[in-house]
């Protein structure tokens, strides 16, 4: 498994992810956001959707062109626009009001790899590159307790703030993980407990009553 920064905004390359395997796949087509990925060249890890032949989804531009998934290739081709070597993807751009803060916009893990820690490892892997680009702070807004926990594992901590759409705002210094406390970690989970989730979120939150912040996940070495 390798970590790669594909590019920085505002002229980053597009990345086409299979919308059947990745949440927010359409967000990674935009060139206005930076992108970083965890990918594999191991043929046993290359994954295509069970729907072997599929049309392009509504987020794609060439709606009239027939697209087919080829299980023998892991890079985009004329017949298959998706990069099947990607295990997890992260999009990012500078904060709109503070150009020293880098905002993580979307973190998406391939469906068969969710829960394996790839999200926080990817988020942590970008941090030294953000420092090299002059950023001193990282920020992300999360809309569910699973993402909250994952970003804690990447060194983020809840700020006590929410966005206008009830996402919890987490931050960390770019160079080192955030300093956090049991009370700070639990207070963010309490905000989610107020929202009366069903399973699996309710069980997840119940299992984290009176627990300390999770251990950090390690970054992945960069190929660049």
Q: Could you say what each language-model-derived stretch is?
A:
Residues 88-90, 107:
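Conserved GNAT-family N-acetyltransferase fold
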Residues 166-170:
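Minor-groove-contacting beta-hairpin "wing" of winged helix-turn-helix DNA-binding domains
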Residues 1-86, 96-104, 131, 158-161, ...:
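Haloarchaeal acidic low-complexity proteome signature biased toward cell-envelope/secretome components but also
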Residues 109, 115-128, 153:
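Conserved acetyl-CoA-binding loop-helix of GNAT-fold acetyltransferases
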Residues 93:
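Segments forming oxygen-rich coordination pockets for charged ligands
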Residues 130-143:
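Conserved GNAT acetyl-CoA-binding A-motif
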Residues 86-88, 119:
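Short, well-structured hydrophobic secondary-structure segments
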Residues 142-165:
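Conserved active-site alpha-helix within GNAT-family acetyltransferase domains
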């Amino acid at each position: 498994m390798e970590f790669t920064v594909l590019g920085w905004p505002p002229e980053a390359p597009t990345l086409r992810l299979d919308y059947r395997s990745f949440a927010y796949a359409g967000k990674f087509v935009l060139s206005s956001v930076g992108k970083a990925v965890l990918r594999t060249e191991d043929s046993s890890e290359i994954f295509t959707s069970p729907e072997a032949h599929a049309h392009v989804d509504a987020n794609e531009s060439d709606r009239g062109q027939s697209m087919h998934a080829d299980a023998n290739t892991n890079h985009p081709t004329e017949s298959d626009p998706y990069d099947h070597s990607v295990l997890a993807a992260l999009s990012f751009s500078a904060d709109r009001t503070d150009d020293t803060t880098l905002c993580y916009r979307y973190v998406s893990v391939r469906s068969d790899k969710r829960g394996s820690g790839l999200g926080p490892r990817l988020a942590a892997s970008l941090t030294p590159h953000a420092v090299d680009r002059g950023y001193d702070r990282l920020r992300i807004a999360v809309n569910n307790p699973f993402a909250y926990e994952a970003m804690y594992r990447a060194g983020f901590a809840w700020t006590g703030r929410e966005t206008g759409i009830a996402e919890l705002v987490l931050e960390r210094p770019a160079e080192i993980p955030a300093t956090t406390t049991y009370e700070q970690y639990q207070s963010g989970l309490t905000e989610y407990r107020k929202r009366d989730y069903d399973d699996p979120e309710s069980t997840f939150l119940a299992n984290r009553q009176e627990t300390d912040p999770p251990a950090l996940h390690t970054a992945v070495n960069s190929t660049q």
